[in-house]
Each structure stands twice: as structure tokens, then as C-alpha cells.
């Protein structure tokens, strides 16, 4: 077998493989004999039909089968001999196979890039440092109470954080427009749900009042016919309401699974959850900086086939989030929506993979156990979740992969230029939410 390797462009390779005539002849005769033994031909006992007749009847299909078998086998042999690692499905281009003659075919494919990670000491990380303060805990308690609050009539003018109930009719140039009319519409003032100027026009008004508000729709408003248009809303204010927060009593506290109903136990549970959330957010922000620095210091080509696979995976994830993964009536989400993220994911995967290979990082059993136990704390019965993971090899392997990735990130962090920055719980969590 003769093999030549050509770099056509970037990571694209073309193999030209020539298989000698004697191997083709041997392969052809083997296939011909097999067909002769298994095919039933009228007038002949099984396996006794003349080969010339077999060739006449099945010659084309035998040649096609031989070509397929020869290409598959010798392509794999060529990859091993040339130490090539293909990405995606190859494109095979055969010439005509003629028994007794050399057979030449070409195979086009992409390969993974060969590189060494470098400049790790040039990666800069600003490591946020934060704790859960008593003030953070009290704020979370108030948020929890607000989430379970009821609304009661307020004998006061409309103000931020109060809820109003209203009827309104919107018009542009004296004409009502679609979607501009509602009855019994509830709105918490200060939430910023409405177009600029709408909520401000309600502030200071009282239940029972009727009034007009003049606003201008933003230029980037979703309805094309309303972009930049001046509008008038005729409003009748039905109610002004305020939140009635539940008391922090045993009945309220037990709703959250705190059996003794004490404020101290509730605070302890909330603090534990906040600290877990903070730890994950801090870890995520450091990881993001590490990966961004790694990408910046190591510019590598990525195989188009790998990016295409990642684009499809991201598309399916998006459809699942919309609950439309199995629907036939969902419009195709274009590749462009996912291209940049897919390329980044592939680059990160290749770079981290090389770090793991170079540093010979293996999953640490203790770390795997810690990861599973940490995940399990979010469930009602953590021990049951831990047992489930250790009894499920697929899930366990997923956690091993996470452990290896964590260890790789820790190695990269140890090589980077790290400075610490004091910050707050809210800043860390808000930043994590914005990045999600």
C-alpha cells in the first residue's frame, strides 16, 4: 500500500492511497467465491454455477463491495501508519476498481490541531473574595417574606414598590392600536416593566382617579408600527395596594422544611444555601477568567466538523429549553446563533484536553465524592442522591470528568497571575446571573 498525505488547507488533509493489484485480485476472488457459494441460480446446484456466469450476474455489485471493503480497511491502516487523528466523517473518492489492477482512491478529512499550551504565566485573574454577611442574610429573609406576601389595599398615593390595578386604553394620533388596551391590569411600580414614562405618570395618583399619560415608544420597540411614536394612554386607577409581609413565626418557617419552626434554624438553612450559591458563583467567575486567558494566550485552529457538531448540540439544548425539541413545526434556528459559542467551546475543550494530557491529570476519588456530596445537599435526602450517583456508572463518569476539569482549572490558576478583590455577595450573585 502506498500512501501520500497532502495538507489542502488549515486542518484539512487528503490521503491518496494505492492498493496493489495482487491484494485487489485476492479480495475480488474471495468475494466472488463467497457469492458463488451462497447464490442460488436456476439449473445449477448450490455452489456449482460457473464463475463466469456469477461474474456476469453479480460482477458490478461484487466490485462495489470490494471497493467499499478495501477503502475502509486501508483508510484505517493509513491513519495508523501516518499517525493521523481524523475529525468527523471522511469523504472518500474512489477511482474505478478493476480486478487485477492497482486501485487508487483519495480520502479528505480534518484532523485535530497539534499544539502545546503556552504562556500560562501570562494569564491574569482578578479573584473575587466575598462572604455571606448578616446583612445579606437579613436581606434574603426579607426577599423570602416578599415572595410569600399578600397584597392589601393601601390608603395612599401610588409609589414605587406598591402595586396598582388599572384599566387603560392607548392611542397613537387618536387611533387605538393593537395590544394597547387592558382591564384589571396589575403592575408593581418601580419594576421597569413598561415603556419609559408610563410608570412615572402613575406615581402620586390615587385609587379612583382617571388621567392621561403621554409617552414615546422607544426606537427599538418590538412592534414595528409603534417604534418612536408618541402615544397617549387614558388610565383609570382601580386600586393601590401594598405588600403585607408574613410574620416570621413557626407556621411560616415550617413551610420551608424547618421542623422546629425557629428563626435560628431557618437562618442557618438559608445561610448554608447562600454560601453554597456564593461558592459556586465565585468558582465560576474565576474559571471564566482562566478560560478566557487560556484562549487569549493560545490561538489554535479548530476543525470545522467539531464546530458543526457543537452547533447542533447547542441548537438541541435551545430547543429543549423552549420545550420544542421533538416538535416538527418549530422553525430551524440558524447556525449563526450558535457559531461563536460553538467555536469557543471546541477551543476550550481542545486546550483543556491538552492541559490534562500534559499534566497527566486523573480524577481524584476524594474530589469526586466531594462533588457528589455537594450536589446532593440541594436535595431533600442527600444520602439517597449520593448512593444513586455511585450506583450509576454514567453519572459517576460525568462527575469524574467534572473533577478532572476542576483539577485542570486549579493547575492553571496556580500558574496564573492572581490578584484578589474584595466584593459583596450581591455583586457576585448579580454578575453570575447576568452571565447565565
Curated annotation (Swiss-Prot):
GO cellular component terms, semicolon-separated: cytoplasm
* Reaction catalysis annotation: [protein]-peptidylproline (omega=180) = [protein]-peptidylproline (omega=0)
Where does this chain mainly localize? cytoplasm
Write down the top EC class of this protein.
Answer: isomerase
Report the subcellular localization: Cytoplasm
Q: Name one GO biological process term.
A: protein transport
The molecular function terms of the Gene Ontology recorded here are: peptidyl-prolyl cis-trans isomerase activity; protein folding chaperone; ribosome binding
Give the Enzyme Commission number. Answer: 5.2.1.8
Q: What is this protein called?
A: Trigger factor
